[in-house]
C-alpha cells in the first residue's frame, strides 16, 4: 500500500481541496495556495517511497520511476501556479475544479508510468484522457473551446476503443497482459505472431494520439486554439512528458528491438510528424495553433530517441521533451504577462512591436524561440545535437537528416515571432501588473535555457 502512497496522496489532496472549495466559498485562492504547497511536499514523498525497486501486482516502483513522477508533478505545479496568477491578472474568480482536474489527470499519469500490465496502463491513461477533455472545454461560454473539446472527446473515445480492442488481441494471442510475458512471447516465437503485433499496434495508437504524433494529430491545432491557455501549458508540458515516459517504458519492456514495430512503425511516424509539424505551422497566424504544430514537430524528434532503443537514445528523448516543455511554458507565460485576458487569442498581430515597451518579455520570448530553433549555446541546441548525434551513431541517417531539414524549416516561423516583436509596427498594449509567480517561472525558464547545457554537460 505504501508503494501507492504518491497516487493516494494526490487523490486525497484533489478531493479534499475540492470539498473545502465548495463548503468555504470565496476562499479558492487561499485553498489553491495550500494545495500547491502540499503538491510541492508530495514531490519529496514520491522520492521517499521510490527507493524500493520491484514490481508489486503489476505496479512497479523504483528510483527512476520516482524521478519521472516528480518531474511530471513539478511541471503540473507550474501549470497550477500559471492558472492561479492568470485568474488574478484577468480579475476572474479562480475555479478550483481546474486544479482538481489537473491533479486527477496526474494521478492517471502516475498509474500509467508505474504500470506493468496493459489493462492497468489503459485505466491510468483513460483517467488522464477524461480529465483532459474537461480541461480542454473549461471555457464554458466559448464556442471554440466547446468545439475543440468535443473533437478531442470524439477522437479520444475512438482511439480508446481501438486501444481496448488491441488489449483483447494481446490477451487472445499472448495469453497474458503482463509486460514480461508479452516480451517473452515476442522474443521466443519462431514465427511472426501477427495477432500479437496487431494488438500492440492498436494499443500504441492511444499513446501516439496523446503524444500528438502523425497520423493521430488532427485534434491538436483546434484543441490548443480553443482551450484556455493554462490548460494548454499542462497539455504541452506535464501531460506530454508523462506520455513520453510511458512510451519509453513500453519500448524498453516490450517492443525492444522487435523490428516490425520498433523500426517500421515508429520510424514512419517520426518522419511524418517532423514533416507535417514543420510545414503545417508556416501559414498559421494564431500563436497557439503555431505551438500546436510545433508540438507535433518536436514529438517527431522525441520519437527518434525512442526508435534508437538504447540508453543514450532514451536519455536524449527524455532530455529533449524536458527542454521543449520548459520553452513552451516560458512562451505561454510571457503571452499571459503581456496580453492578460487576450492571451487566448494571441496572434502575430497582438505581439507586433512589443519590444519597444516590453523589452524583458520580448527578450524572454526571443530566447525561447532561439532555443527551439537550436541556436548555440542555448539548451535547445544541446538537446538537438545530442539527439541527432545518437541517431547518426546508430546509422539512422534518414532520421537525422530529416530532423536537421525540418529544424531549418521550423526556424522560419520561430524567427517570424521574433520579427513581429522587434521589426513590425508597434501596437498599443495595456500594461498589466507584474505577478511574482509568473515572473519567477520566466526567470527560471531563461536560466534553464541559457545555463542548462552547461549544467547537463557536467
Swiss-Prot record:
Cell inner membrane as UniProt keyword: yes
Gene (UniProt): nuoN
Membrane topology (UniProt): Multi-pass membrane protein
Entry GO MF terms: NADH dehydrogenase (ubiquinone) activity; NADH:ubiquinone reductase (non-electrogenic) activity; quinone binding
EC number(s) from the headed UniProt entry: 7.1.1.-
Catalytic reaction list: a quinone + NADH + 5 H(+)(in) = a quinol + NAD(+) + 4 H(+)(out)
Subcellular location, record wording: Cell inner membrane
GO cellular component: plasma membrane
GO terms for biological process, alphabetical: ATP synthesis coupled electron transport
Lineage, opening ranks: Bacteria, Pseudomonadati, Pseudomonadota, Alphaproteobacteria, Rickettsiales
Function: NDH-1 shuttles electrons from NADH, via FMN and iron-sulfur (Fe-S) centers, to quinones in the respiratory chain. The immediate electron acceptor for the enzyme in this species is believed to be ubiquinone. Couples the redox reaction to proton translocation (for every two electrons transferred, four hydrogen ions are translocated across the cytoplasmic membrane), and thus conserves the redox energy in a proton gradient.
Species assigned in the record: Rickettsia felis (strain ATCC VR-1525 / URRWXCal2) (Rickettsia azadi)
Stretches that traverse the bilayer: 4-24, 30-50, 62-82, 94-114, 118-138, 153-173, 194-214, 235-255, 261-281, 290-310, 318-338, 361-381, 397-417, 438-458
Name of the protein in its database record: NADH-quinone oxidoreductase subunit N
Matching InterPro entries: NADH-Q_OxRdtase_suN/2, ND/Mrp_TM
